[in-house]
Amino acid sequence: MNAQISRNSLSQVAKLTFTFALVALIALAAGCGGGGGAVANNPGPTPTPAGTTSTQVRFGDAPADSVIAFEVSVSSLSLTPAAGGAPIAVTVPANNRIELTHASGKFEPFVTGNLPQGTFSAANLTLVNSELTFLSGTGTPVHINGPASASITVPLSPNLTISGPLVLNIDVNVGASITTAGGVVNGIAFTPTSFTITAKAPGAAANQQDDDGEIEDVQGTVTAVSGSSFTLKVGQAGSSLTFATDGTTQFKDGVTTVASLLNQVVTVEGFTQADGSLFAKEVEGLESNTGAEVEGLITAISGTTLTVNAHDGIGSGMDDTKVGASFSVNIAGLSASKFRVKAGNGFGGGLPSATFPFDATTIHQGQRIEVDTNAAVPPASGAITPDKINLQQQGVSGTVANKAASTFDINLATDSALRIISGQTVVHVTTNSSTDTRVSVANGGSVQVRGLLFWNGTSWQMIARRIR
């Protein structure tokens, strides 16, 4: 549909970056065919064949507050050898559907596998059925459909040389891919300039960040277990990730051992090992195979009923057709212990707190949450009966003001979705020793922050995990 948006809206949309860190599920380099998603009988880490390197595909996006949903499917992916020859195909999961705004300011694992060592001069992508939704100044959702299919070849300059375990990052600038006529948005058109491709080796386990191997708040259903390893089907992305464990791995909330994980919906925290394989430091149970979880943005609250726009989910009744749909969630009767904070890495304990509260009285429209339920997810627009409500990290962007040693304010743009939804114009940000800061924060400058967003009854308070 066509939609009139302001220049300010376009500048906000331009900040949206759709990122694939190509943890390449390279169908064993030279040519496995077929779609992904099948689980091997033995989910243990696959030995790296001679002449190949363990690599990882991740996805994410940079915060863009005006955008409340961006969905896309990856139909094909390959790398072109610099010396010539056929492109090396990357096997992507069948029927994958990726929603990116929930990963604002963060890279998330997509798939893992083995990539042939060598030098590559281009990446080739086919993206299908892209969709973008943002809020107008009056709070009306504006939906833009992209092309049914878009194939793009992105030159790599300089060439990409793969010689050891690696994380490949592909940033897709959605703002640069929007077409307009007379100030009216009329479509999405991906071009080579939409993409920036970089690469990093896995970082030291204790200090990893999202772009060099960190595993933070990765959710899915365990589809196979073997010995000390398990395989996780991640959300609606459809990808399968295999994790190793050992005696240091912590099991929580109803899961006690690897053997107890089968068919469970879980959250995993961990890191990428030096050889490129994945290790689980913590595994937390969410629901049994009769339940589900749905992640999304609270767009409205009426009494005790939340309206949630779904970003992702897993479990009974959840499928890719429900990504982007709205659901109602009635929190009446939930005890204080049912409201939790999904802190992940870098926040420590002690949340929620008096300064950073999260309960039935301080939950607020504009926050990202995860709804855990013991029942199946209903059809779109249906009512989800919650068992637990978990606060999740989200991205916020704007202009810096009142900078101090460990605090600053973000002034939200007039068309910011958070501002429109909540009616608030400022977010107060607190940093700590674990905040991953990649840019200089100065009054008057633009900033993109990912963290936990709390409502204290009068104002927004955010603890920053990342500043970009």
What does each model-found stretch correspond to?
Residues 306, 394-434:
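Intrinsically disordered, low-complexity segments enriched in Gly and acidic/Ser/Thr residues
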Residues 33-305, 309-313, 338-400, 406, ...:
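A short, solvent-exposed, low-complexity linear motif enriched for acidic/polar residues
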Residues 28-31:
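C-terminal motif of bacterial Sec signal peptides marking the signal peptidase cleavage site
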Residues 350-352, 409-423, 428, 439-442, ...:
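C-terminal functional regions that serve as terminal interaction/effector modules
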Residues 7-12, 49, 240, 434-435:
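Compositionally biased regions
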Residues 238-248, 314-334, 415-432:
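A short macromolecule-binding patch
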Residues 2-20:
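Bacterial N-terminal signal peptides that target proteins for export
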